[in-house]
Amino acid sequence: MTTLIVIVLYLCLLLGLGFFSSRLFRGTSKDYFVASHSIGPFLLLMSVFGTTMTAFALVGSTGKSFERGIGTYGLMASISGLVHAGIFFLIGIRLWAFGKKYGYITQIQFFRARFESDRLGYLLFPILVLLVIPYLLIGIIGAGKTIEPVTAGAFSEIFTNPTAPQWLGGIPPWLTGLVVSMVVLTYVFLGGSRGAAYANTFQTIVFMIMGVVAFVYIIQGLGGLEQAGKVPARINEKGVIVQDYRFDKQARELLKNDPPKPIGKVLDSESSNLTDTQPHLSRTPVAVEFKKKNPKTGEISSFERELGIPFITFVSYFFIPLSVGMFPHLFQHWLTAKSAKAFRLTVIAHPLCIMVVWVPCVLVGAWASGVLPPGIPPPAVLSAMLNLLVGDPVLTGLLTAGVLAAIMSSLDSQFLCLGTIFTNDIVLHRAGSKKYSDKQVILIARVFIVVIVALTYALAMWAKNANVFDRIT
């Protein structure tokens, strides 16, 4: 219960920040959509970085590393740091200049003017919406998968149908998703892009600090950095995958399994000698078979998984970071900048911030393979490790709040951008900018944002069992 109280207090603090930022709102549509082009270097860095670090980055990367190993870092993070910075420098600054000069608020306005085509704008609208919707879904899904394990047992008599038996009494994903959606909707509804910028900055600072703290505590729980490297699941001389260690929650220490605990077996591999190797610490593909227990029926079943990253998959992921140049929420953040000089800090520091966030998440996922059951849902790996290795409920609550901060710092900008492009590129473009007053324009955007939030929540509940990483890639 203590953990839940800490999380609730964090959400209340975030709502308070939302109400505060709404008092800075200047009441104009330009301020609602692009903060009157007044965001400085630090706020720009925090809002842009916070927007890119979704549940995909934290919850998804940890879960994918648990499934495939540390090669997950190479799939996205290493190349993303360089590509993102390059796009911010080569494209972001130029688009900001065009927006400042010609009054663009959305990228559809830019493309319509550049190619002198109304039809192109109508074609881009559904494409951009479909580009953003999956990220909204993984935010809501990721939040639900994060909260349920760490609140297990808090309401055993109320929530009796958990995702997994050990999470009985935890806050169900549908309730977490609803609360997160309402909190984000509140401060975006009131403050627009200025409110989102301040909230993003606060939340980005929170999740970066809490991420480092969580990493340190997990390392301590595993007996130090050197010992943590020995924890991932190992392949023995018979081709059986074993866990050499277990974490005793009562003794609060890592204990050695004697004999090692078998959890699966190797089916196929490109390597001929796998004895004593840890597949989660290698990129070499290894086909394995695990067993898992159905949480509802208790039936034991087998499932196959490929550890490691095939070369063709590794190479193909190099192209994914290029998509950042077309994200409408990032375009909108670029236009909030006070000047071109405000981009300097973002271009330089963004790759470093990515490293600070992704390295711990990927390592924790690999380490988790040695202490968690292989059948655990990948999106729940991060919160399960926190719940297992961090004994203090207050600290667990703070660390979980950090994960929620990363999720919500993306949701707000994405909800806002959809309201912005609908209002400006569909409603105002067809009706004319003079038909509606500034207050009416803001109202139209707010109503559409409410509709998008409701639709996203409904879709997230329909797809709640999806893997957060694979939902995007």
Region locations from a protein language model:
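Transmembrane helix-loop junctions in multi-pass membrane proteins
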Residues: 2, 20-22, 56-64, 70-71, ...
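Helix-loop-helix module between adjacent transmembrane segments
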Residues: 75-188, 243-265, 286, 319-320, ...
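Loop-to-transmembrane helix boundary motifs in multi-pass membrane proteins
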Residues: 113-122, 129, 165-176, 423-467
